[in-house]
Regions:
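Amphipathic alpha-helical protein-protein interaction surfaces
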Residues: 21, 68-71, 141, 145, ...
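Transmembrane alpha-helix interface motif
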Residues: 1-49, 53, 58-61, 154, ...
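Interfacial helix-loop-helix linkers and transmembrane-helix boundary segments
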Residues: 71-79
Length: 284
């Protein structure tokens, strides 16, 4: 459970850590848009431009990680945490995509070249999105994320949307992700000390073995929620009141540099898509 990096803040003094939280949130959204803008093309020329687009997104993440002074292993843990989902998605693409040239066939399972390309495309897209999202949570504290979301959603207050309450919910959710992961790890170790086996057997047996973990975790979650509610109540917390900020967010030259960089990434991906499309049209 400690392999999941999403939601865990890594304190450091770096270019990215000192950026405005609002700019970081918008930059991650723009980065995800750039990843989705990379088109899926099944021709050889189109695939080359497609992976150039993914390469540009990966280069952007690597530069951002270096500027954030976050260990690469810490960022890669986010991929390890969802490896099962990534592998399952790739298998479904490979075995159940009938379009393209058939490379192998067993019973109802057909492996085609298009299926392999789509599987690689899907793995690259999911991995890049998770890397970018985890970099946001690693370099931005839950309080900063909540303040950033509240500031960005401020115009919704005019239509009576509970912006502050929504930001508070997001902040608490992000704050409790690492707490619940640590609690899960502690319960699993306690169960293993009592002779529980979570590593052997098929997937159904492993899921069944996790039942003694889920029930204590659920009880612990409710207990922590009650403790947090009591703590907020004892401090007379009220989300409806106008609240001041200890640290006000201000944009600096770092945010301008990041904005130019993400705009350049999106323009580059769009240019690669257009070039790849034109190359395919010319060949046809």
């Amino acid at each position: 459970m400690k392999d999941v990096a999403f939601g865990q803040y890594y304190p450091a003094k770096s270019f990215v850590h000192n950026m405005d939280a609002r700019v970081k949130i918008l930059a991650v959204i723009a980065y995800i848009v750039a990843v989705f803008l990379v088109q899926s093309v099944t021709t050889a020329q189109g695939v080359a431009f497609q992976f150039l687009g993914f390469g540009a997104c990966l280069f952007f993440v690597l530069i951002a990680t270096l500027c954030a002074r976050v260990p690469f292993g810490k960022v890669l843990k986010s991929i390890k945490g969802i490896m099962f989902f990534i592998v399952l998605s790739a298998i479904l693409q490979i075995f159940f995509n009938a379009s393209g040239n058939v490379l192998a066939k067993w019973s109802f399972i057909t492996i085609t070249d298009v299926g392999l390309l789509n599987a690689g495309f899907l793995v690259a897209r999911i991995s890049l999105i998770v890397l970018g999202a985890s970099l946001l949570t690693l370099t931005t504290s839950p309080v900063e994320i909540a303040d950033g979301i509240e500031s960005l959603m401020y115009p919704l207050k005019f239509i009576k949307f509970p912006v502050h309450e929504f930001a508070l919910i997001m902040s608490i959710a992000l704050r409790f992700i690492p707490t619940l992961l640590d609690e899960t790890d502690r319960i699993i170790k306690a169960q293993k000390a009592r002779g529980a086996d979570f590593d052997s057997g098929n997937i159904l047996k492993r899921v069944k073995a996790l039942m003694p973990v889920l029930i204590p975790l659920l009880i612990s979650s409710f207990r922590r929620a009650d403790e947090l509610a009591d703590a907020m109540d004892s401090r007379c917390y009220s989300g409806s009141k106008v609240r001041t900020k200890y640290k006000k967010m201000r944009s600096t030259w770092r945010d301008l540099v990041a904005t130019v960089a993400i705009a350049g990434l999106i323009c580059g991906v769009v240019a690669l898509n257009v070039t790849g499309f034109l190359a395919v049209v010319v060949l046809l």
